[in-house]
Structures are given as structure tokens and as C-alpha cells.
From Swiss-Prot:
Gene3D superfamilies: Cytochrome c oxidase, subunit Va/VI. Component of the cytochrome c oxidase, the last enzyme in the mitochondrial electron transport chain which drives oxidative phosphorylation. The respiratory chain contains 3 multisubunit complexes succinate dehydrogenase (complex II, CII), ubiquinol-cytochrome c oxidoreductase (cytochrome b-c1 complex, complex III, CIII) and cytochrome c oxidase (complex IV, CIV), that cooperate to transfer electrons derived from NADH and succinate to molecular oxygen, creating an electrochemical gradient over the inner membrane that drives transmembrane transport and the ATP synthase. Pathway: Energy metabolism; oxidative phosphorylation. InterPro entries: Cyt_c_oxidase_su5A/6 (IPR003204), Cyt_c_oxidase_su5A/6_sf (IPR036545). GO terms for cellular component: mitochondrial inner membrane; mitochondrial intermembrane space; mitochondrial membrane; mitochondrion; respiratory chain complex IV. One of its GO terms (molecular function) is electron transfer activity. It comes from Homo sapiens (Human). It comes from the Eukaryota. This is Cytochrome c oxidase subunit 5A, mitochondrial. It is a peripheral membrane protein. The modification Phosphothreonine is found at residue 141.
Length: 150
């Protein structure tokens, strides 16, 4: 209510009536209205690495996840400046298998390789950790499919 009253006062102060009774904008500015600056801080607690991993594993382990939610989760995960932990990738690959979405499994593995960037030891480590899951689900790596040469 105070904000509305201040706006009404500011509008009234910036208009004047001429001799015919018509309202016109005043040539001089009205009284200055104090604007309070607000700082936007994140007051929430920081998410730990374990909580982050658990959140994404839970997301991909949803039994009723659909293809759109899967792609949305993968795309969101890709935007982070990090390589996902193997347990997150494992959950995502299992979600792909539940949906029979082979293309997404290959895309996930390609993204992991791309996110590793110049650190050549990360991708082989992730594949080594995921090898039992890849064998269980019958998923081939992009290298096994020959996609790394394309």
C-alpha cells in the first residue's frame, strides 16, 4: 500500500493544471522518490557433491520417467561445468534402456568424452567404471561403433 501511495504522490507532483483545467506534465521534476536497492543473495545452503549425485541418480531412477524427461535431465546435466560421476551416468543409461532409447545412450557417452576435454584420463576411467553396466545392458561405446572416426 505504501508503494501505491508513493506512486500516486509522484504522479500528482509531476502534473499541473493550466488555466483551462487541463492536466499537463510539469516541466520540473517532482519530489525525488527514494529507491531502495535490494541485494539478491542466495541464502540457501550449498548442495554437497553427495547430495548432487543423489539428486540426479534419483531423477534418472524414476520408474515413470519418459523420453522428454530423460532428454531434459541429460541436457540440464550437460550444462554444468563438470563431468558427471559414473553413478549418475549409470542411472541415466539404465533409464535409456528402460525407454529403449539407444541413441541417447550413445549421446550420453559422447557428451562425457566431450566434457572431459583435454583431460584424457577421465573418459577411460568413466568407461572402466561403467563397463559392467554397458555389458549388462548391451550398450556399445561410440569407439566400438566406429563413431569416433566420423
Amino acid at each position: 500500500m505504501l508503494g501505491a501511495a508513493l506512486r500516486r504522490c509522484a504522479v500528482a507532483a509531476t502534473t499541473r493544471a493550466d488555466p483551462r483545467g487541463l492536466l499537463h506534465s510539469a516541466r520540473t521534476p517532482g519530489p525525488a522518490v527514494a529507491i531502495q536497492s535490494v541485494r539478491c543473495y542466495s541464502h540457501g545452503s550449498q548442495e554437497t557433491d553427495e547430495e548432487f549425485d543423489a539428486r540426479w541418480v534419483t531423477y534418472f531412477n524414476k520408474p515413470d520417467i519418459d523420453a522428454w524427461e530423460l532428454r531434459k535431465g541429460i541436457n540440464t546435466l550437460v550444462t554444468y561445468d563438470m563431468v558427471p560421476e559414473p553413478k549418475i551416468i549409470d542411472a541415466a543409461l539404465r533409464a535409456c534402456r528402460r525407454l529403449n532409447d539407444f541413441a541417447s545412450t550413445v549421446r550420453i557417452l559422447e557428451v562425457v568424452k566431450d566434457k572431459a576435454g583435454p583431460h584424457k584420463e577421465i573418459y577411460p576411467y568413466v568407461i572402466q567404471e561403467l563397463r559392467p553396466t554397458l555389458n549388462e545392458l548391451g550398450i556399445s561405446t561410440p569407439e566400438e561403433l566406429g563413431l569416433d572416426k566420423v
